[in-house]
Amino acid sequence: MRASKIIQEAALLSGRGDIADYIEATDRTNFSKETSKACNQMVTLLNMMISELCTSFIPMIATEKIYATDKIEYDKLSKNAVEILKIYDAFGKEVDFKVDYEHVKISSPCAKVVYKFHPKTYALTDNIDYEEKDISGSVLAYGLAAEFALTEGDFDRACSFHDRYVEGVHAISKPKNSTVK
């Protein structure tokens, strides 16, 4: 899922077709500084929103092949790990581990690590680490439109978008076996 597509959708929801056009344009010299600034603000808001979302509601999870015999250094992982969930050996059997400050101690050689991570700061053209199966781009666009409306001082619109965003996040993050009473 590309950051630019989420921002475009949020811009259109917010009545800011100029930002959507700015993102699509190959030559941006004809756009105002205000449009460029608003687009950059949306990129910043998207990063803040994703950071909150991955730490509070829908974690980003990576599965990575890595070979280690006694410990895994955090800097050897491709993403910024915040919690190690599982470690497997070459045969798919879970490996016992202990988390330390600088590394993870493992009880036997491992081949795969599953962990929660905090994403990098995304640029407009980056793909974000969420996939549509994790959360839809439309839900993210509603959240971004809500945040942007707050910065514009449009509290009624912000509440409307926020309600849609929260409804989408709760529908996704609700346990699969939960029942409604």
Language-model features: where?
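Glycine-enriched, solvent-exposed interface loops adjoining structured elements
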Residues: M1-K181
